[in-house]
Regions:
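Catalytic, metal-anchored helix/loop core of enzyme active sites in primary metabolism
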Residues: 1-383
């Protein structure tokens, strides 16, 4: 039996991970659960899974914690993440919190010699070099939970140590796959939130519409698989059945296919290298009939170009891209800027911030704050 700490247990990834624990009680024991502010949902999870540690990063008084969940240790604020990631003994730590706080949690878990399952994009986007160095020091791979990176990771298990020459990173294309750049400029919030295949939170759904989600995944893939950005090709695949693929020197391409169901990559990370039933529907290729593929378009979706530019620039460029995009998306979701302004704000922030170092966590957090400040100023002018 494996013990698991889940950071961000009330979100989409966290709740699906707990579904798998519920399905396989003989496989897993939950030792820590954290949430940001969904206290009632967290209380329910604590009652069911009875962890040793539970916490809320948005603190509440201990008097507001129900008597029947006080059997475990409660931690509030940022300390909740640190306690769950590094203090409570756990075989593995699933980091599914949103935002750059995930970087600190990943580093804390690695520092405590934990097996880390990463469902937080910011950890690798902003601090990929630090994360991979720390993982190398303890001799444990970073296990990706993103469906695309999990697909690549799974394909590489059958590669016999052969290194790929190209990664094919698939993308649904989002709701604006067939729109012109001009049409996208003034797309509404409701239009951008209509994802064709996946049910996700508002931020990641907007990122899918702008393809900044795929830009972040290019950066993640670079660090996870030590692949230069020019060898990572985005392939638009509207059916979301091929989750990604790898190409080898002999021309062979290995791909991972399946219905869109996040329980599959979550379960693979939780049981690696074994596989367990997930409750996912079997893939029926006959009912799908046709799989189609298109090249990613960096003209209509500037995010695809910016990912490679930021990786080649080095330093804190990827951190600046990430922070600026978060601020721009937040402004768009408040109906303060048009959809087309998101990429303009990110490009403007990258230009204004220039070269910044990313040698330490402090450097990265400073660059993130500066990017957010600059992006907010630019967004204010576009209102």
């Amino acid at each position: 039996m494996q013990t698991i700490a889940i950071l961000g247990s009330t979100g989409s990834i966290g709740t699906q991970a707990l579904e798998l624990v519920r399905l396989h009680p003989e496989e897993f024991r939950v030792v820590a659960l954290t949430a940001r502010s969904s206290r009632e949902k967290l209380f329910e999870q604590v009652r069911e899974f009875r962890p040793e540690v539970a916490g809320l990063t948005e603190p509440i008084p201990m008097s507001e914690i129900p008597e029947d969940v006080r059997f475990c240790r409660w931690v509030m604020g940022e300390e909740a993440l640190r306690a769950a990631a590094a203090e409570v003994p756990a075989d593995m730590v699933l980091v599914s919190v949103v935002g750059i706080a995930g970087l600190q949690s990943v580093m804390d878990a690695l520092g405590a010699n934990r097996q880390v399952l990463v469902a937080n994009k910011e950890a690798l986007v902003t601090g990929g070099h630090l994360v991979m160095d720390a993982a190398k020091r303890i001799g444990k791979p970073i296990l990706p939970v993103d469906s695309e990176h999990s697909a690549i990771f799974q394909c590489l298990q059958g590669a016999g140590g052969n290194q790929p020459v190209r990664l094919l990173l698939t993308a649904s294309g989002g709701p604006f796959r067939t729109w012109t750049r001009e049409q996208m400029q003034n797309a509404t919030r409701a239009q951008a939130l209509k994802h064709p295949n996946w049910s996700m939170g508002a931020k990641i759904t907007i990122d899918s519409a702008s393809m900044f989600n795929k830009a972040l995944e290019i950066i993640e893939a670079h660090w996870l698989f030590d692949m230069p950005p020019e060898k990572i090709q985005v392939v638009v695949h509207p059916q979301s059945i091929v989750h990604s693929a790898v190409e080898f020197a002999d021309g062979a391409v290995l791909a991972q296919l399946g219905v869109p169901d996040m329980r599959v990559p979550i379960a693979y990370a939780m049981t690696y290298p074994r596989r367990i039933p997930t409750g996912s529907k079997p893939l029926d290729l006959f009912s799908i009939g046709t799989l189609t593929f298109e090249p990613g378009d960096p003209v209509r979706f500037p995010a695809l170009r910016l990912a490679g530019e930021c990786l080649n620039a080095g330093g804190a460029a990827c951190t600046i891209l990430n922070g600026a995009n978060e601020m721009a998306v937040a402004a768009f979701l408040r109906d303060e800027i048009p959809f087309g302004a998101i990429s303009r704000i990110v490009e403007g922030t990258l230009e204004a911030c220039g070269a910044m170092p990313a040698d330490t966590l402090e450097d990265i957090f400073h660059a993130d704050l500066e990017a957010r400040r600059v992006a907010k100023e630019i967004a204010e002018k576009l209102k």
